[in-house]
UniProtKB/Swiss-Prot annotation:
EC code(s) of this entry: 3.1.11.6
Record keyword Cytoplasm present: yes
Natural source organism: Acaryochloris marina (strain MBIC 11017)
Identification of the protein by name: Exodeoxyribonuclease 7 large subunit
One Pfam family, short name: tRNA_anti_2
NCBIfam families reported in the protein's UniProt record: xseA
Assigned protein family: Belongs to the XseA family.
Protein's UniProt keywords contain Nuclease: yes
Biological processes, Gene Ontology terms: DNA catabolic process
Subcellular location per the Swiss-Prot or TrEMBL entry: Cytoplasm
Molecular functions (GO terms): exodeoxyribonuclease VII activity; nucleic acid binding
Gene this chain is encoded by: xseA
Lineage summary: Bacteria, Bacillati, Cyanobacteriota, Cyanophyceae, Acaryochloridales
Entries under InterPro entries matching the protein: Exonuc_VII_L, Exonuc_VII_lsu_C, OB-fold_nuc-bd_dom
Subunit structure: Heterooligomer composed of large and small subunits.
Source organism superkingdom: Bacteria
Protein backbone atom coordinates (compact mmCIF):
# COMPACT_ATOMS: atom_id res chain seq x y z
CA UNK A 1 0.00 0.00 0.00
CA UNK A 2 1.32 3.44 -0.91
CA UNK A 3 1.65 5.67 2.16
CA UNK A 4 -0.23 8.96 2.09
CA UNK A 5 1.95 12.05 2.05
CA UNK A 6 0.08 14.88 3.80
CA UNK A 7 0.21 18.45 2.61
CA UNK A 8 1.80 20.33 5.51
CA UNK A 9 0.81 23.78 4.27
CA UNK A 10 -1.82 25.29 6.59
CA UNK A 11 -4.87 26.44 4.52
CA UNK A 12 -6.64 29.72 5.18
CA UNK A 13 -9.63 27.92 6.69
CA UNK A 14 -9.48 24.92 9.02
CA UNK A 15 -12.27 22.76 10.51
CA UNK A 16 -13.30 23.08 14.10
CA UNK A 17 -13.96 19.95 16.13
CA UNK A 18 -17.69 20.60 15.79
CA UNK A 19 -17.34 21.19 12.06
CA UNK A 20 -15.55 17.86 11.59
CA UNK A 21 -18.06 16.08 13.80
CA UNK A 22 -21.01 17.64 11.95
CA UNK A 23 -19.51 16.51 8.65
CA UNK A 24 -19.11 12.93 9.91
CA UNK A 25 -22.65 13.04 11.33
CA UNK A 26 -24.06 14.10 7.96
CA UNK A 27 -22.16 11.33 6.18
CA UNK A 28 -23.41 8.60 8.51
CA UNK A 29 -26.95 9.69 9.32
CA UNK A 30 -27.89 10.64 5.75
CA UNK A 31 -26.47 7.46 4.21
CA UNK A 32 -29.41 5.52 2.69
CA UNK A 33 -27.85 2.19 3.65
CA UNK A 34 -27.51 3.18 7.31
CA UNK A 35 -31.00 4.68 7.71
CA UNK A 36 -32.32 1.15 8.28
CA UNK A 37 -29.69 -1.52 8.83
CA UNK A 38 -29.65 -5.11 10.18
CA UNK A 39 -26.69 -5.97 12.43
CA UNK A 40 -25.86 -9.43 13.80
CA UNK A 41 -23.58 -9.90 16.78
CA UNK A 42 -23.10 -11.18 20.32
CA UNK A 43 -24.27 -9.12 23.31
CA UNK A 44 -21.11 -8.43 25.34
CA UNK A 45 -22.78 -6.10 27.87
CA UNK A 46 -26.35 -5.01 28.61
CA UNK A 47 -28.10 -2.79 31.14
CA UNK A 48 -31.67 -1.57 31.64
CA UNK A 49 -32.21 2.07 32.61
CA UNK A 50 -35.29 4.20 33.00
CA UNK A 51 -34.77 5.55 29.49
CA UNK A 52 -34.33 2.12 27.87
CA UNK A 53 -31.80 -0.64 27.13
CA UNK A 54 -28.10 0.12 26.66
CA UNK A 55 -25.96 -2.74 25.33
CA UNK A 56 -22.91 -3.54 23.21
CA UNK A 57 -22.74 -5.87 20.20
CA UNK A 58 -19.48 -7.49 19.13
CA UNK A 59 -18.33 -10.06 16.60
CA UNK A 60 -17.62 -13.54 17.94
CA UNK A 61 -13.94 -13.01 17.14
CA UNK A 62 -14.12 -9.67 19.06
CA UNK A 63 -12.73 -7.90 16.01
CA UNK A 64 -15.23 -5.06 16.30
CA UNK A 65 -17.98 -3.76 18.58
CA UNK A 66 -20.71 -1.14 18.55
CA UNK A 67 -22.73 0.56 21.28
CA UNK A 68 -26.50 0.22 20.95
CA UNK A 69 -29.55 1.77 22.58
CA UNK A 70 -33.27 0.97 22.58
CA UNK A 71 -35.47 3.73 23.95
CA UNK A 72 -38.43 2.98 26.20
CA UNK A 73 -40.95 3.73 23.46
CA UNK A 74 -39.79 0.56 21.64
CA UNK A 75 -39.14 -1.72 24.63
CA UNK A 76 -42.70 -3.08 24.90
CA UNK A 77 -42.60 -4.18 21.25
CA UNK A 78 -39.36 -6.18 21.45
CA UNK A 79 -39.41 -9.82 20.38
CA UNK A 80 -36.49 -10.50 22.75
CA UNK A 81 -34.49 -8.45 25.23
CA UNK A 82 -30.69 -8.18 25.03
CA UNK A 83 -28.90 -10.67 27.29
CA UNK A 84 -25.14 -11.05 27.67
CA UNK A 85 -23.77 -13.95 25.63
CA UNK A 86 -26.77 -14.17 23.28
CA UNK A 87 -26.34 -13.98 19.51
CA UNK A 88 -28.98 -11.54 18.22
CA UNK A 89 -30.10 -9.64 15.14
CA UNK A 90 -30.76 -5.91 15.65
CA UNK A 91 -32.73 -3.57 13.38
CA UNK A 92 -32.02 0.14 13.67
CA UNK A 93 -30.19 3.17 12.29
CA UNK A 94 -26.83 4.83 12.94
CA UNK A 95 -26.74 7.94 15.13
CA UNK A 96 -23.76 10.21 15.90
CA UNK A 97 -23.38 11.95 19.30
CA UNK A 98 -21.16 15.04 18.78
CA UNK A 99 -20.59 15.67 22.51
CA UNK A 100 -18.73 12.36 22.87
CA UNK A 101 -17.52 12.05 19.30
CA UNK A 102 -19.12 8.58 19.10
CA UNK A 103 -21.58 6.79 16.87
CA UNK A 104 -24.00 4.05 17.96
CA UNK A 105 -26.88 1.93 16.70
CA UNK A 106 -30.31 3.20 17.73
CA UNK A 107 -32.29 -0.06 17.54
CA UNK A 108 -36.04 -0.56 17.17
CA UNK A 109 -36.31 -4.34 17.27
CA UNK A 110 -34.28 -7.42 18.29
CA UNK A 111 -34.56 -10.98 16.98
CA UNK A 112 -32.80 -14.21 17.94
CA UNK A 113 -30.09 -15.20 15.47
CA UNK A 114 -29.29 -18.73 14.20
CA UNK A 115 -31.89 -21.42 14.94
CA UNK A 116 -34.07 -18.95 16.81
CA UNK A 117 -34.21 -16.71 13.74
CA UNK A 118 -35.19 -19.62 11.50
CA UNK A 119 -37.97 -20.54 13.92
CA UNK A 120 -39.19 -16.95 14.01
CA UNK A 121 -39.22 -16.68 10.21
CA UNK A 122 -41.09 -19.98 10.00
CA UNK A 123 -43.74 -18.78 12.45
CA UNK A 124 -44.14 -15.41 10.73
CA UNK A 125 -44.55 -17.03 7.31
CA UNK A 126 -46.99 -19.59 8.70
CA UNK A 127 -49.14 -16.89 10.27
CA UNK A 128 -49.15 -14.80 7.08
CA UNK A 129 -50.11 -17.75 4.85
CA UNK A 130 -52.76 -18.78 7.36
CA UNK A 131 -54.32 -15.33 7.09
CA UNK A 132 -54.33 -15.72 3.30
CA UNK A 133 -56.29 -18.97 3.68
CA UNK A 134 -53.69 -21.32 2.15
CA UNK A 135 -54.14 -23.84 4.98
CA UNK A 136 -57.95 -23.67 5.05
CA UNK A 137 -59.38 -27.25 5.06
CA UNK A 138 -62.27 -26.05 2.88
CA UNK A 139 -59.77 -25.25 0.10
CA UNK A 140 -58.35 -28.78 -0.06
CA UNK A 141 -59.13 -30.98 -3.07
CA UNK A 142 -60.51 -34.52 -2.77
CA UNK A 143 -58.46 -37.39 -4.18
CA UNK A 144 -59.78 -38.97 -7.42
CA UNK A 145 -61.79 -42.18 -6.95
CA UNK A 146 -59.55 -44.40 -9.08
CA UNK A 147 -56.60 -42.52 -10.65
CA UNK A 148 -54.88 -44.03 -13.66
CA UNK A 149 -51.75 -41.83 -13.54
CA UNK A 150 -49.87 -40.38 -10.56
CA UNK A 151 -47.00 -37.87 -10.57
CA UNK A 152 -44.09 -38.11 -8.11
CA UNK A 153 -41.76 -35.23 -7.20
CA UNK A 154 -38.69 -36.28 -5.20
CA UNK A 155 -34.97 -36.98 -5.62
CA UNK A 156 -34.00 -39.95 -7.80
CA UNK A 157 -31.19 -40.69 -5.32
CA UNK A 158 -33.42 -40.68 -2.24
CA UNK A 159 -34.78 -43.79 -0.53
CA UNK A 160 -38.20 -42.12 -0.74
CA UNK A 161 -38.39 -42.81 -4.48
CA UNK A 162 -37.70 -46.51 -3.95
CA UNK A 163 -40.31 -46.74 -1.17
CA UNK A 164 -42.94 -45.07 -3.35
CA UNK A 165 -42.23 -47.31 -6.34
CA UNK A 166 -42.45 -50.50 -4.28
CA UNK A 167 -45.69 -49.44 -2.59
CA UNK A 168 -47.41 -48.36 -5.81
CA UNK A 169 -46.35 -51.53 -7.64
CA UNK A 170 -47.64 -53.76 -4.84
CA UNK A 171 -50.97 -52.01 -4.28
CA UNK A 172 -51.73 -50.50 -7.68
CA UNK A 173 -50.91 -52.87 -10.58
CA UNK A 174 -51.29 -51.09 -13.89
CA UNK A 175 -50.95 -47.58 -12.38
CA UNK A 176 -48.81 -45.27 -14.52
CA UNK A 177 -46.21 -43.23 -12.61
CA UNK A 178 -44.75 -39.95 -13.94
CA UNK A 179 -41.46 -39.23 -12.14
CA UNK A 180 -40.30 -35.60 -11.99
CA UNK A 181 -36.87 -35.60 -10.27
CA UNK A 182 -35.69 -32.68 -8.15
CA UNK A 183 -33.28 -31.67 -5.42
CA UNK A 184 -34.84 -31.93 -1.97
CA UNK A 185 -32.10 -30.27 0.09
CA UNK A 186 -29.95 -27.16 -0.16
CA UNK A 187 -30.32 -23.57 -1.35
CA UNK A 188 -31.27 -24.58 -4.91
CA UNK A 189 -33.92 -27.06 -3.77
CA UNK A 190 -36.94 -24.67 -3.53
CA UNK A 191 -36.62 -23.50 -7.13
CA UNK A 192 -35.96 -27.07 -8.31
CA UNK A 193 -39.07 -28.39 -6.50
CA UNK A 194 -41.25 -25.67 -8.05
CA UNK A 195 -39.94 -26.52 -11.53
CA UNK A 196 -40.56 -30.24 -10.92
CA UNK A 197 -44.18 -29.55 -9.94
CA UNK A 198 -44.65 -27.33 -13.00
CA UNK A 199 -43.34 -30.15 -15.25
CA UNK A 200 -46.03 -32.51 -13.97
CA UNK A 201 -48.75 -29.88 -14.42
CA UNK A 202 -47.57 -29.03 -17.93
CA UNK A 203 -47.54 -32.73 -18.90
CA UNK A 204 -51.23 -32.88 -18.02
CA UNK A 205 -51.59 -36.64 -17.54
CA UNK A 206 -51.26 -36.98 -13.77
CA UNK A 207 -54.50 -36.99 -11.75
CA UNK A 208 -52.78 -36.76 -8.36
CA UNK A 209 -49.27 -35.64 -7.27
CA UNK A 210 -46.99 -36.97 -4.52
CA UNK A 211 -44.31 -34.59 -3.15
CA UNK A 212 -41.93 -36.51 -0.88
CA UNK A 213 -38.52 -36.92 0.75
CA UNK A 214 -37.17 -38.96 3.65
CA UNK A 215 -36.57 -37.70 7.17
CA UNK A 216 -33.71 -35.47 8.21
CA UNK A 217 -32.63 -32.62 10.41
CA UNK A 218 -34.75 -29.48 10.56
CA UNK A 219 -32.37 -27.58 8.31
CA UNK A 220 -32.52 -30.43 5.76
CA UNK A 221 -36.28 -29.92 5.42
CA UNK A 222 -36.02 -26.12 5.14
CA UNK A 223 -36.82 -26.12 1.42
CA UNK A 224 -40.32 -27.44 2.22
CA UNK A 225 -40.91 -24.34 4.37
CA UNK A 226 -39.99 -22.05 1.48
CA UNK A 227 -42.83 -19.77 0.38
CA UNK A 228 -42.25 -20.58 -3.30
CA UNK A 229 -42.76 -24.30 -2.69
CA UNK A 230 -45.82 -23.73 -0.49
CA UNK A 231 -47.50 -21.54 -3.11
CA UNK A 232 -46.67 -23.98 -5.92
CA UNK A 233 -48.47 -26.74 -3.99
CA UNK A 234 -51.40 -24.46 -3.15
CA UNK A 235 -51.83 -23.46 -6.82
CA UNK A 236 -51.48 -27.01 -8.17
CA UNK A 237 -54.66 -27.87 -10.16
CA UNK A 238 -54.56 -31.55 -9.11
CA UNK A 239 -54.65 -32.94 -5.53
CA UNK A 240 -51.25 -33.06 -3.79
CA UNK A 241 -50.18 -35.68 -1.23
CA UNK A 242 -47.16 -34.75 0.91
CA UNK A 243 -44.86 -37.41 2.35
CA UNK A 244 -42.05 -35.43 3.95
CA UNK A 245 -39.80 -36.56 6.82
CA UNK A 246 -41.23 -38.53 9.72
CA UNK A 247 -44.19 -38.25 12.08
CA UNK A 248 -42.43 -35.64 14.24
CA UNK A 249 -41.78 -33.35 11.27
CA UNK A 250 -44.37 -30.81 10.09
CA UNK A 251 -43.50 -28.46 7.28
CA UNK A 252 -45.57 -25.75 5.64
CA UNK A 253 -45.74 -28.01 2.58
CA UNK A 254 -47.55 -30.59 4.76
CA UNK A 255 -50.03 -27.96 5.94
CA UNK A 256 -50.89 -26.75 2.44
CA UNK A 257 -51.07 -30.20 0.82
CA UNK A 258 -54.52 -31.71 0.23
CA UNK A 259 -53.44 -34.86 2.09
CA UNK A 260 -50.52 -35.06 4.57
CA UNK A 261 -49.04 -38.56 4.99
CA UNK A 262 -45.74 -37.71 6.81
CA UNK A 263 -43.72 -40.50 5.11
CA UNK A 264 -43.18 -41.40 1.43
CA UNK A 265 -44.57 -44.92 1.93
CA UNK A 266 -47.69 -43.59 3.64
CA UNK A 267 -48.12 -41.05 0.82
CA UNK A 268 -48.15 -43.85 -1.77
CA UNK A 269 -50.64 -45.79 0.35
CA UNK A 270 -53.03 -42.81 0.22
CA UNK A 271 -53.67 -43.38 -3.50
CA UNK A 272 -57.20 -44.86 -3.69
CA UNK A 273 -57.16 -48.56 -4.60
CA UNK A 274 -59.63 -50.43 -6.80
CA UNK A 275 -60.23 -52.92 -3.98
CA UNK A 276 -61.21 -50.04 -1.69
CA UNK A 277 -63.76 -48.90 -4.26
CA UNK A 278 -65.16 -52.43 -4.50
CA UNK A 279 -65.46 -52.56 -0.71
CA UNK A 280 -67.32 -49.24 -0.69
CA UNK A 281 -69.69 -50.55 -3.33
CA UNK A 282 -70.43 -53.70 -1.32
CA UNK A 283 -71.04 -51.56 1.75
CA UNK A 284 -73.52 -49.45 -0.21
CA UNK A 285 -75.40 -52.58 -1.28
CA UNK A 286 -75.46 -53.79 2.32
CA UNK A 287 -76.82 -50.45 3.55
CA UNK A 288 -79.48 -50.48 0.84
CA UNK A 289 -80.58 -53.97 1.91
CA UNK A 290 -80.81 -52.84 5.54
CA UNK A 291 -82.92 -49.81 4.58
CA UNK A 292 -85.31 -51.89 2.47
CA UNK A 293 -85.60 -54.53 5.20
CA UNK A 294 -86.46 -51.86 7.76
CA UNK A 295 -89.10 -50.43 5.45
CA UNK A 296 -90.59 -53.89 5.03
CA UNK A 297 -90.65 -54.41 8.80
CA UNK A 298 -92.39 -51.06 9.30
CA UNK A 299 -94.97 -51.96 6.67
CA UNK A 300 -95.53 -55.35 8.27
CA UNK A 301 -96.05 -53.77 11.68
CA UNK A 302 -98.53 -51.35 10.16
CA UNK A 303 -100.47 -54.22 8.63
CA UNK A 304 -100.59 -56.02 11.97
CA UNK A 305 -101.86 -52.86 13.60
CA UNK A 306 -104.63 -52.49 11.04
CA UNK A 307 -105.55 -56.14 11.44
CA UNK A 308 -105.90 -55.67 15.20
CA UNK A 309 -108.15 -52.66 14.68
CA UNK A 310 -110.38 -54.63 12.35
CA UNK A 311 -110.74 -57.41 14.87
CA UNK A 312 -111.77 -54.92 17.53
CA UNK A 313 -114.34 -53.27 15.25
CA UNK A 314 -115.82 -56.67 14.26
CA UNK A 315 -117.30 -55.25 11.07
CA UNK A 316 -117.04 -57.82 8.30
CA UNK A 317 -117.40 -55.40 5.47
CA UNK A 318 -114.74 -53.03 6.72
CA UNK A 319 -112.52 -56.01 7.46
CA UNK A 320 -112.79 -57.18 3.87
CA UNK A 321 -111.87 -53.75 2.53
CA UNK A 322 -108.89 -53.57 4.85
CA UNK A 323 -107.90 -57.09 3.85
CA UNK A 324 -107.94 -56.14 0.18
CA UNK A 325 -105.99 -52.95 0.87
CA UNK A 326 -103.45 -54.87 2.90
CA UNK A 327 -102.95 -57.36 0.09
CA UNK A 328 -102.48 -54.56 -2.41
CA UNK A 329 -100.01 -52.77 -0.20
CA UNK A 330 -98.12 -55.97 0.45
CA UNK A 331 -97.99 -56.87 -3.24
CA UNK A 332 -96.97 -53.35 -4.15
CA UNK A 333 -94.24 -53.31 -1.52
CA UNK A 334 -92.92 -56.73 -2.50
CA UNK A 335 -92.96 -55.72 -6.15
CA UNK A 336 -91.10 -52.50 -5.33
CA UNK A 337 -88.54 -54.37 -3.26
CA UNK A 338 -87.98 -56.98 -5.97
CA UNK A 339 -87.72 -54.24 -8.57
CA UNK A 340 -85.18 -52.27 -6.51
CA UNK A 341 -83.18 -55.38 -5.71
CA UNK A 342 -83.23 -56.38 -9.38
CA UNK A 343 -81.96 -52.96 -10.40
CA UNK A 344 -79.24 -53.13 -7.76
CA UNK A 345 -78.18 -56.60 -8.93
CA UNK A 346 -78.07 -55.47 -12.56
CA UNK A 347 -76.04 -52.41 -11.57
CA UNK A 348 -73.71 -54.62 -9.56
CA UNK A 349 -73.21 -56.99 -12.51
CA UNK A 350 -72.53 -54.05 -14.84
CA UNK A 351 -69.98 -52.55 -12.47
CA UNK A 352 -68.39 -55.98 -11.96
CA UNK A 353 -68.03 -56.34 -15.74
CA UNK A 354 -66.47 -52.88 -15.95
CA UNK A 355 -64.08 -53.70 -13.13
CA UNK A 356 -63.11 -56.96 -14.82
CA UNK A 357 -62.48 -55.20 -18.14
CA UNK A 358 -60.24 -52.67 -16.38
CA UNK A 359 -58.17 -55.38 -14.66
CA UNK A 360 -54.96 -55.79 -16.68
CA UNK A 361 -54.39 -59.27 -15.23
CA UNK A 362 -57.51 -60.56 -17.02
CA UNK A 363 -55.95 -59.64 -20.36
CA UNK A 364 -52.76 -61.46 -19.40
CA UNK A 365 -54.73 -64.57 -18.37
CA UNK A 366 -56.07 -64.86 -21.95
CA UNK A 367 -52.56 -65.55 -23.16
CA UNK A 368 -51.33 -62.05 -23.79
CA UNK A 369 -48.08 -60.67 -22.42
CA UNK A 370 -46.89 -57.21 -21.36
CA UNK A 371 -43.53 -56.39 -22.99
CA UNK A 372 -41.42 -53.57 -21.55
CA UNK A 373 -37.97 -52.19 -22.16
CA UNK A 374 -35.47 -52.02 -19.32
CA UNK A 375 -36.52 -48.40 -18.66
CA UNK A 376 -40.17 -49.56 -18.25
CA UNK A 377 -41.40 -48.28 -21.65
CA UNK A 378 -44.26 -50.44 -23.00
CA UNK A 379 -43.40 -51.96 -26.40
CA UNK A 380 -46.15 -51.47 -28.97
CA UNK A 381 -44.17 -51.65 -32.23
CA UNK A 382 -40.97 -53.19 -33.57
CA UNK A 383 -39.91 -49.65 -34.42
CA UNK A 384 -39.17 -49.19 -30.70
CA UNK A 385 -36.73 -52.15 -30.69
CA UNK A 386 -33.22 -52.97 -31.73
CA UNK A 387 -31.54 -56.30 -32.26
CA UNK A 388 -29.89 -57.67 -29.10
CA UNK A 389 -32.05 -55.35 -26.94
CA UNK A 390 -33.04 -56.79 -23.57
CA UNK A 391 -36.77 -56.87 -22.77
CA UNK A 392 -38.90 -57.71 -19.73
CA UNK A 393 -41.95 -59.89 -20.50
CA UNK A 394 -44.69 -60.07 -17.84
CA UNK A 395 -47.26 -62.91 -17.98
CA UNK A 396 -50.36 -63.61 -15.94
CA UNK A 397 -48.17 -65.66 -13.61
CA UNK A 398 -44.56 -64.47 -13.35
CA UNK A 399 -42.24 -62.70 -15.75
CA UNK A 400 -38.99 -63.36 -17.60
CA UNK A 401 -36.28 -61.50 -19.52
CA UNK A 402 -35.92 -61.86 -23.29
CA UNK A 403 -33.45 -60.57 -25.89
CA UNK A 404 -34.32 -59.46 -29.44
CA UNK A 405 -32.65 -61.65 -32.05
CA UNK A 406 -34.50 -60.42 -35.13
CA UNK A 407 -37.05 -57.76 -36.08
CA UNK A 408 -39.93 -58.09 -38.53
CA UNK A 409 -42.32 -55.19 -39.16
CA UNK A 410 -46.04 -55.74 -39.70
CA UNK A 411 -47.44 -55.01 -43.20
CA UNK A 412 -49.02 -51.81 -41.88
CA UNK A 413 -45.71 -50.62 -40.38
CA UNK A 414 -43.93 -51.42 -43.63
CA UNK A 415 -46.47 -49.33 -45.56
CA UNK A 416 -46.05 -46.49 -43.07
CA UNK A 417 -42.28 -46.56 -43.54
CA UNK A 418 -42.67 -46.37 -47.34
Amino acid sequence: MTSYQPNLLVPPEVLSVKGLTDYIQTLLEDDSYLVQVWVEGEVSSAARHRSGFFFTLQDQQEAASIHCVIWNSYCDQLVIEPEVGEQILALGRIRVYPQRGQYQLMAWQLFPAGEGLRSLRYQQLRERLTREGLFDPLQKQALPTYPQTVGVVTSHQAAAWGDIKRTLKAQHPGLKVLFSPTKVQGKQAPEAIVLAIERVIKDGRAEVLIVARGGGATEDLACFNDERVVRAIAECPIPVISGIGHQRDETLADLVADVCAHTPTAAAECIPRLTDWQTDYRNCIARLYIILTRQLDVAHEHLLYQKTRLRRLQIDRQFEREQVLRSRLQNHLLHAIKHRLGQAQQHQQLLQQQLTSLDPTQVLKRGYALVQTTDQQIVRSTQQLQVDQELKVELAEGHFTARVTALQSSPQEADDER
